């Protein structure tokens, strides 16, 4: 593995078992993560400890849900989720850079009861999930999977903290004692159509908003990572997850750790499933740099980013940042989260 981003040709694979079980050479694992974050912001993880049977149940129940007719899926439409921003959306309802993505999906988050203080206050992105009434296996798998991912997210953020020369508890002490955890299940139809003079992407070029994304993908492939030399494929690796850092970690590290653009297209003759889990700062956490910003890095960030917007100019809480993004992804839900 190399630190120089221009020489990145593939996404590295890192065994994180030392972080998960909190034994062995954690510093070595943290160093590998640090090199990957500086080079491309993307890396596979193995040795993560997430039960393979749970992953199979999640995939099987998800396929059952998406195989239903549209009317049945719309019974848990996002419009019914209100300020919690949960539920199903059909193909074309989600936008990236103002263009409709060729995918459908379900949005989930931490399951919170109506009497939870943040739900009672009406804080957006907090509340109960919407689950299909006739697929209890999906509910069980989603909630168990989110618990496992949250635990894994804490372990990985400890490794990222150590990779930066910080105490392992740095992020938990300041940002993720109560992380904003968001989970998506996406289904990409197998018949992508051309739009105008180019392809219609499952997800167009974008970066993620928060700290860390942990992605489970099926064996169809299609994820691509942007590099100075072009787009690098990130094909499926058995029993691995793809991790990438988000805009807030890019901001915190003054661009040393890169929130790298990526995109998705369907490369096979069948539908593709993906399962991104977002481990993000607390909604009310004010995002501040860990180190002094390097003006050169900040300038090159603006020039290179897909949206020509520097994350290093952002001031405010993570809630401020993600709500501004929500209004662009789902314009029709803007009123419910404002």
For the regions a language model picked out, list residue spans one by one:
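C-terminal flanking tails of non-heme Fe-dependent oxygenases
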Residues: 1-97, 102-103, 125, 143-144, ...
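Residues that line or immediately flank small-molecule/substrate-binding pockets and catalytic motifs
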Residues: 18, 109-110
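A short, charged helix-loop
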Residues: 110-141
């Amino acid at each position: 593995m190399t630190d120089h981003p221009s020489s990145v040709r593939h996404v590295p694979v890192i065994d994180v078992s030392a972080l998960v079980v909190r034994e062995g050479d954690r510093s070595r694992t943290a160093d590998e993560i640090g090199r990957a974050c500086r080079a491309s912001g993307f890396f596979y993880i193995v040795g993560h400890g997430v039960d393979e049977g749970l992953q199979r149940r999640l995939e099987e129940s998800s396929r059952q849900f998406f195989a239903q007719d549209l009317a049945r899926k719309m019974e848990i439409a996002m419009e019914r989720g209100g300020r919690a921003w949960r539920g199903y959306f059909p193909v074309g309802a989600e936008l990236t850079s103002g263009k409709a993505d060729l995918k459908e999906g379900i949005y989930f988050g931490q399951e919170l009861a109506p009497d939870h203080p943040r739900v009672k206050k009406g804080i957006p992105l907090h509340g109960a999930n919407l689950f299909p009434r006739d697929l209890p296996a999906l509910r069980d798998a989603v909630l168990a999977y989110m618990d496992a991912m949250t635990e894994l997210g804490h372990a990985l953020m400890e490794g990222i903290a150590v990779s930066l020369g910080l105490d392992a508890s740095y992020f938990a002490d300041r940002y993720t004692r109560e992380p904003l955890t968001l989970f998506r299940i996406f289904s990409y139809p197998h018949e992508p159509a051309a739009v105008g003079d180019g392809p219609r992407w499952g997800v167009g070029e974008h970066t993620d908003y928060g700290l860390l994304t942990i992605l489970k993908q099926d064996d169809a492939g299609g994820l691509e990572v942007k590099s100075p030399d072009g787009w690098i494929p990130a094909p499926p690796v058995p029993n691995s997850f793809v991790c990438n850092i988000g805009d807030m970690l890019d901001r915190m590290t003054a661009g040393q750790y890169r929130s790298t653009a990526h995109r998705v297209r369907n490369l096979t003759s069948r539908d593709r499933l993906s399962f991104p889990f977002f481990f993000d700062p607390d909604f009310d956490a004010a995002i501040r740099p860990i180190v002094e910003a390097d003006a050169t890095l900040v300038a090159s960030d603006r020039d290179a980013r897909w949206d020509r917007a520097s994350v290093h100019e952002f001031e405010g809480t993570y809630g401020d940042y993600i709500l501004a993004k929500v209004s662009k992804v789902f314009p029709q839900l803007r009123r419910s989260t404002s």
